Amino acid sequence: MNKFIIIFLASVCSNLTFSADKVKGLGLSKCTTFNSVAIEEKVIYMSWVAGFITSQNIFKDKLHAKNITYNMSQSWLESFCYKNPNIIFERAVNKFIFEFTK
């Protein structure tokens, strides 16, 4: 039984380590998809953005963007995605992070 627990814990911990840099979910959709969803559904995308930025804070550098509102974030991402419709959404969010945490 103890061997089973040790193997189980080792596999769970190793999966967490190897999956830390993998993007999942809405981040894999293209910018054109983000721009085409209804306003009510953009809340889901912006929730993904908040989670992604949080993960960047945990795994990489501490990000401190000041005076950035929810509406400003959404508007910036909409504008960027309008200009770059074929880029995946995660890259747009990375660009947003780069622009506002200089």
Predicted regions and their residues:
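Sec-dependent N-terminal signal peptides
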Residues: 4-14
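Short N-proximal segments of mature Sec-exported proteins
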Residues: 20-79, 83
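Surface-exposed, polar helix/loop patches in the mature regions of secreted/periplasmic/lumenal proteins
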Residues: 74-102
